[in-house]
Structures are given as structure tokens and as C-alpha cells.
């Protein structure tokens, strides 16, 4: 890690022992481990997303398992003839197996994708591991991310655009993000969509896109939290709200939704802010 980040071993020892690292240092450590700052600080609400192949650390408690790329999930909403494809970790695949019969399911995916599924409005789910080949072999129109971008890149995108303080984002990480932007042909508008874009798949086949402007009163966070933690035992209203672009207040009926595609880091950070005491206890 020291060789990759340029942070001295003694400084890394201090951080590991509990001394506070700068945000830039934590981000550089996270990029060296192909994960997020939330993960290395133990404040990830969703399972770690490791942007590498062949990593699986099996622990006694499934909640603490760490895994990397497993394969791909294809989701076919009702009244649609187009699968939506996403890259998932082995831990995500195990959770899908456990929760597949729930009314609602939350699926953390790689490349900063988080899915909310209303299973009553999902026609079919396809799971393909490495041995099955690529989704394009069964879906010629497949559009798929490879899952190779560490979550810390998405955490730092806004600062990449606007922040000059090297205690928040290092030149090294800015260069890495710049390379990802070139490879993926991201423009500034694309970056904003990566940070807070939402795609809504309705059960009549209509698809809408928007940008989240998170408000602490938005109960989309409660919807995701309850579905992920409590499953069918959670309490759900008929509708949920979110604040969209230009501060537009949106109210959606859950039974009219097939799927929500959300930005994982944005949702995780806001869930942490709202539920911090419940999740991590008092400092």
C-alpha cells in the first residue's frame, strides 16, 4: 500500500492505530485496495464492492464477507422486452439467492449501481457467472459495465471537478480519475449522472431519468433501508418521495414501480447520515 500510495509505512501504521488520516490519504488507500473510503473506515452500509477479480474472504458472519466480481445479473421488468444488465459480487449473488422470494429486494451492484426491485413487477431475473459466458451471448442488445471502477472514484468525482485542496483529493487520484474519464468518455454531465443519477422503471414500460438532490426528509431512504434490512418484515407506505433535479418534490406509488436504479455511494452516505446512531452507535 505504501508503494502504491506514496504514504509512508509509519504514517500508515499511525492511521491503522487510530490516528485520523486526511480525506486524500484515505482515498488513496481506498484506491490501492480497489474499494471505498466507507469500506476501509468500516462505515459501509452495503457490502464491500471490490473492483478486482477472484477475491473472497469467507467469515462466520455473512454480513462481514468480502468478495469481488462474481458475474452478471439480468433483470427483465414487466411490459419490457429489454433486460437491464449489472455486474455483481459473489456476496450480492448469495443475498439474491436468500431474498429472491421477498416482495422487495435491494441489490448493491458494482460500478456504483444500487437497485430496488418490486418483485411483483419483475418478469425474470437471469444470473450468469463466469462459466456462463457474457450476457451478449443471450442478449445481443446487452449494455454492461465491467465493474472495474473502484467506488472511491465515484466518492471523489465531485471533488475531482471542483476541489483544489490536496488534503481532500490528491494529484495521484485526480490522475487516476482523469484516466477513467478518458477510457469511458465521460463528460462533466456524465459525471453528475454518475454521482446522483436515478433511473425509474415503471410497470407500464415507461422509463424516466432524473438526478437526486437528497433532502433529509426524503423517504426513499426509508424505503431502501427497510427493504434491505427487514425485507418482508419492514413497514412500507403506499408511496415514497424523493427530491429530484431543481428541487422538484416527487411522490411515486410503489406498486407502479418495477425497478429503481440508484447511485450506491449517494444512497449509502445519506443512509449513514440519517441512521448513524442506529448503525454504528455513539462515538
Model-derived features with residue positions:
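Short alpha-helical "recognition helix" segments of helix-turn-helix
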Residues: 1-4, 29
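Short C-terminal boundary/hinge segments that cap the last helix of small helical domains
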Residues: 34-51
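Short acidic, Gly/Pro-enriched loop/turn segments at secondary-structure junctions
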Residues: 127-142, 261-278
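Surface-exposed beta-loop interaction hotspot
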Residues: 126-192
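DNA major-groove recognition helix of helix-turn-helix/homeodomain DNA-binding modules
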Residues: 23-39
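Phosphoinositide-dependent membrane-docking surfaces
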Residues: 116-128, 251-265
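Helix-turn-helix/homeodomain-like alpha-helical modules used for DNA recognition
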Residues: 46-113
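Recognition helix of helix-turn-helix/homeodomain-like DNA-binding domains
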Residues: 6-21, 43
Amino acid at each position: 500500500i505504501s508503494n502504491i500510495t506514496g504514504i509512508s509505512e509509519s504514517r500508515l501504521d499511525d492511521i491503522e492505530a487510530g490516528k485520523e488520516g486526511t480525506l486524500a490519504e484515505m482515498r488513496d488507500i481506498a484506491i490501492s485496495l480497489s474499494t471505498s473510503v466507507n469500506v476501509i473506515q468500516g462505515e459501509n452500509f452495503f457490502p464491500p464492492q471490490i473492483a478486482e477479480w477472484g477475491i473472497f474472504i469467507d467469515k462466520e458472519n455473512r454480513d462481514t464477507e468480502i468478495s469481488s466480481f462474481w458475474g452478471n445479473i439480468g433483470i427483465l421488468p414487466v411490459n419490457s422486452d429489454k433486460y437491464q444488465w449489472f455486474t455483481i459480487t459473489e456476496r450480492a449473488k448469495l443475498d439474491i439467492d436468500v431474498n429472491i422470494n421477498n416482495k422487495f429486494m435491494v441489490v448493491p451492484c458494482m460500478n456504483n449501481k444500487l437497485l430496488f426491485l418490486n418483485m411483483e413487477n419483475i418478469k425474470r431475473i437471469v444470473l450468469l457467472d463466469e462459466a456462463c459466458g457474457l450476457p451478449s451471448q443471450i442478449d445481443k442488445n446487452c449494455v454492461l459495465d465491467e465493474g472495474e471502477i473502484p467506488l472511491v472514484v465515484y466518492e471523489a468525482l465531485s471533488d475531482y471537478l471542483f476541489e483544489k485542496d490536496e488534503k481532500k483529493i490528491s494529484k495521484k487520484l485526480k490522475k487516476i480519475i482523469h484516466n477513467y474519464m478518458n477510457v469511458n468518455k465521460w463528460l462533466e454531465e456524465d459525471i453528475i449522472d454518475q454521482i446522483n443519477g436515478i433511473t425509474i422503471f415503471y410497470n407500464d414500460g415507461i422509463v424516466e431519468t432524473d438526478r437526486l438532490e437528497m433532502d433529509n426528509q426524503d423517504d426513499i431512504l426509508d424505503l431502501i433501508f427497510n427493504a434491505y434490512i427487514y425485507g418482508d418484515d419492514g413497514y412500507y407506505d403506499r408511496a415514497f418521495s424523493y427530491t429530484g433535479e431543481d428541487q422538484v418534490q416527487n411522490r411515486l406509488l410503489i406498486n407502479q414501480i418495477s425497478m429503481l436504479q440508484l447511485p450506491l455511494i449517494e444512497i449509502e452516505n445519506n443512509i449513514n447520515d440519517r441512521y448513524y446512531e442506529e448503525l454504528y452507535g455513539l462515538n
